[in-house]
Structures are given as C-alpha cells and as structure tokens.
Swiss-Prot record:
<comment type="similarity">
    <text>Belongs to the FKBP-type PPIase family. Tig subfamily.</text>
</comment>
<dbReference type="GO" id="GO:0051301">
    <property type="term" value="P:cell division"/>
</dbReference>
<keyword id="KW-0143">Chaperone</keyword>
<keyword id="KW-0413">Isomerase</keyword>
<protein>
    <recommendedName>
        <fullName>Trigger factor</fullName>
        <ecNumber>5.2.1.8</ecNumber>
    </recommendedName>
</protein>
<dbReference type="InterPro" id="IPR037041">
    <property type="entry name" value="Trigger_fac_C_sf"/>
</dbReference>
<dbReference type="InterPro" id="IPR005215">
    <property type="entry name" value="Trig_fac"/>
</dbReference>
<dbReference type="GO" id="GO:0044183">
    <property type="term" value="F:protein folding chaperone"/>
</dbReference>
<dbReference type="InterPro" id="IPR008880">
    <property type="entry name" value="Trigger_fac_C"/>
</dbReference>
<dbReference type="GO" id="GO:0015031">
    <property type="term" value="P:protein transport"/>
</dbReference>
<keyword id="KW-0131">Cell cycle</keyword>
<dbReference type="InterPro" id="IPR001179">
    <property type="entry name" value="PPIase_FKBP_dom"/>
</dbReference>
<dbReference type="InterPro" id="IPR027304">
    <property type="entry name" value="Trigger_fact/SurA_dom_sf"/>
</dbReference>
<dbReference type="Pfam" id="PF00254">
    <property type="entry name" value="FKBP_C"/>
</dbReference>
<dbReference type="InterPro" id="IPR036611">
    <property type="entry name" value="Trigger_fac_ribosome-bd_sf"/>
</dbReference>
<dbReference type="InterPro" id="IPR008881">
    <property type="entry name" value="Trigger_fac_ribosome-bd_bac"/>
</dbReference>
<dbReference type="Pfam" id="PF05697">
    <property type="entry name" value="Trigger_N"/>
</dbReference>
Amino acid sequence: MGVSLKKLEKSVATIELTIPSEKFEEGLNFAFKKNASKFNVPGFRRGKAPRVIVERYYGEGVLYEDAVEYVFDEAYKEALKTFNLEPVDYPDINILQIGKGKDLILEATVPVMPEVELGEYKGIEIEKIEYNVYDGDVEYELEKLRQQNARIVPVEGRPAESGDIAVIDFEGFIDGKPFEGGKAENYELELGSNTFIPGFEDQIIGHNVNETFDVNITFPEDYRVEELRGKSAVFKVTLKALNKKELPELDDEFAKDVSEFETLDELKADIRKKLEEKNRVEAENEMKEKAVMKVVENAKVDIPDVMVERQIDISLRDLDYNLRYQGLDLNSYLSITGKTLENLRKEMWDGALNRVKTQLVIDKIAKVENIEVTEEELENKLKEMAANYRINLEEFKKSLTESQINSIKEDIAYYKTIDFIFSKCKIISKEE
C-alpha cells in the first residue's frame, strides 16, 4: 500500500492512497459475499449466480462501493498515522483509478487539527487594573442587609404607596375571557419593584384595602408566554391588605443581630474587606482576559471552517437552553428579533472563531510548558462541584463518565494555563 500527502493547506489535508490490486480484489470478494442474496440473475436462483456472471449482468461497478469501503478504512488510518494527522471531520473521497486487476487509487480530503504557531506569550505587558472601594459601596451593602432583615408591618389608614407590599387577588381577562395563568389569590407584590407586568403595579397605588378595581395592561412583545405577547388584558383586582417594611436602625445591636461582630464599625470593616477582595479578583480576571487576548493575537493558526461551525452549534444549543428558562426557545427568539438562523450563524462566526483559536492556543501553551492536572487538583475540583450540587462526593464521582472526567480535567488545565500566562505578564501601572 502506498500513501502520499499531496497538500496541506489551511488545515485541510489531501492524501493519496494506493491500494494494491490484490487487496482490492479481496474487497471485491467481500462485497460480493455481502450482497450475493440481492442479485437476481436469469437462469440462477436468487443469490446463487457466480460473481463473474453477476459482474457481467449488472456491470463490474456493482461491487465497487462496498469494496472501496472495505479497503479504505485500514489505508486511511495508516496514512493518518504516517503523517501524524488528527482529523476533525469525515473525509471526502475521490476515486482516481478503479478497475478489476488494477491498483485502486483514492484521494481523501479531510480537515485536520491545525498546527498552532505561537507568538510571544511570556512577558506580555498588561496595564494594571484596580477598583477602589468607596464609602458609598459599603453603605449600599449595609442597606441591603437592612432590607433583608426588615420587619413586615401592616399599613393602616392610608391608600397604597410605592414601596408598600400589596396582598391582592386578581383575575385577568382578554376579550372578556379568562386566560390560563391569569388568576391568583393572596399574591404579594412590592409596589414600585417593577417585577410584575409593566404598568400593573402603578395602577394599584392610590387604592385602599378591600377595594376592587380594574387594571388595564398590554403584555410586552417579549413576554415569556408566547400566546399573550402584545395582547391587551383587563385584571379584576382586590386589594386585601397592605404591608410595609420596617427597617432596623444601623447601630451596634444591628451588627450583633446580622453578623458575628460586636460593633457596627467592625461590620463595616468586614464588608469593606470583602468588597476589596471581590474587586481584586474582578480586576485580576479582567487583566487575565486582556493577556489571553494578546497571546491569541500573537499566535498564527489556520482553523478549518468545520471547527467554527461546530462551535456555533454549541453556542446555539446554549442559547436555546437559556431561552427556555425565560419561556422562549430559539425559534421564538428568531421570530421576535426578525432574524433567520442563517443570519444568526453569520453573526456568531467571529466570536466562535475566536473561541476556537483561544482554545487551540491555550492547549498548545499547556503542551509546550508541560502543564498537567494533578490528582489533587482534580480531587479538589470534584469536591467543589459536589458541594455546589449538594451531593455526596463519592456518589458524584460514581455518576461521572470517563468523558465527563476528561472534560473536567481539560477545564482545570485551561485555567491553570491562563494562570501561568498571567504569572509571566509584566503589569504596567498607569503612571508608568
């Protein structure tokens, strides 16, 4: 058997395979035995005609397809091994020569894993990013704590105001008919929170407890229930009760109630410390992102289109998955935005290309720098994931397939390599 690499351009390989005539004859015999029962030749019972008669009656080419398939796989695998190629899709096969008693010559064209030519990835200059924590940030967090620890007390002697918590019964009607999901009792709604249908909360303000009234709304065009989008509805609403939040005083007693600290100043100091750490991590992640962008820009790699198309497929599946949490799906999203699937795929192309290139470059650096995942790192990641899923660690491990474990290890290696790149960066202060 002979193999030759005719060309390798833009990560698409064209390989010529020469299969000896005797090997192809073996394939023809295999094809005949496989299909013998299908041949119906006059003068012979079905499946009993000799091969020479079958070829004369149907034509010599009747066995070619299965014969080529029989001999191709072995020759193709040998060629990939010889030229150290890793295919990323199925090959297109072109027959250059075929015939009884002749060597079979095939041409296989296949996109392969691209070779990455790394540029500079050590000593990358990155401008330092810092986020300060201001007094207002601390006060904002304190106010959130107050809201979380507020007492709910009844409102008496006045109509509803913004900020009140209204307890309502309601039933919605479209064209005078009730609709599914449009009815509730003892529903708590904070007025002014903008968490309900637009315009609904505003029309409760000014009404008194035990009052029944109409609320007129129009459902938004992007409403989660497709059947209700853009439709006008009338809700019969009864205001059953009004409550409000009574916020605790910001003092040492408050600090003792909501934390392990004895004084408000200690609580403030802890909040500031946590915000500073949060900002440090956020700033570091942004610098890492900028470093990776520069490293990827410095690298050269010809990426086959099929790898980008597959990344777009993944992005579309993720988009559809997230849309379903909002009561939508990909088709309804396309309808709302007025886009076609083809247009959306085109919009996603550049982002998908960058994601594929980034992954390839990071993988190459990991290989060059011998960055590997230790058993301890894998164990720690599995512990973290099990804790997040609130499942026993051993049970979680047993639930994972080998493919899933490999995927987790790849993620660890990916971020470990990014940490390596960042550790080699030169951080430049803005003043420099």
